[in-house]
Amino acid sequence: MTQILHVSDTHLDKRQYGQDLRRTDFADAFDASVDIAIDEGVDAVIHTGDLFDDPTPSVPAVNRCLDTIGRLEDAGIPFLAIVGNHERKREEQWMDIIKRFGNAKRLSKSPTVVTDANGNDPVSVYGIDAIRSPEWDGYDFTLDEPESNDHVTILCMHELVQPLVPEHRGDPYDLSEDVLDRLNFLPTALALGDYHSTCNDTVDGVKVFYPGATERCKVSERGTPSVYLLNIKDGELSRKTRAISTAGRENVPRPFLTVNIDF
């Protein structure tokens, strides 16, 4: 059985409420997701965008990120990622630097194959970076064919799509018309980022899911920060949710206290 951990929206270097403590919290949450990957002994980690909170992260944040990804390399676990809208730059991306560190790779329209330790249960993983709105209508969604028809296929994207994302949340695209109908083949699954709530659905026979963010980015985000453990066996993909808190780190994620004040 091949196992892949799906992580998204880590927003490293986010100094929420102007607090350095929160910057550390986001880094700790990413570390916790790696704790889970190592604990589960997964065959790869996929990250579906917004690794960093903005295009110009601080040097300490980049170094902490590399240290965390280095833990995956020490465990022999590849780190496969796409670029989100928050960290996106005009030309070369942060993933182009990070991928120079051994086990990291920036996903593309060509498949990256992941298998279990014995070479069984192959998965072809694809990635499309966050697409700028003016480029959406003319974007070419053509993917290279997988090496074999027996591969499970996963496409990673960083977009808001209906029906998983409510219409009032950021003007989401229609998943069937705006994405799936424009692909040259339907993947087994669509692993998504950008939406910070954990949710899933099946659309046109494709399993579609958001793991949500690894830390709480807004006070209005009340879900449990989580990652997905994807299990692939005999051509079938199943999914299990693991809360970031199950890594066992103190105050990761940090609990919020909401106080309503009547005037």
What function would you assign to each model-found segment?
Residues 15, 131-133, 160, 233-235, ...:
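Generic structural motif
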Residues 6, 47, 202-203, 232:
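Generic beta-strand structural signal
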Residues 55-209, 213-231:
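His/Asp/Glu-rich metal-coordinating catalytic cores
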Residues 112, 211-263:
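Binuclear metal-dependent phosphoesterase catalytic core
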Residues 45, 190, 240-242:
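Generic beta-strand hydrophobic packing signal
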Residues 1-68:
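N-terminal active-site segment of His-dependent metallophosphoesterases
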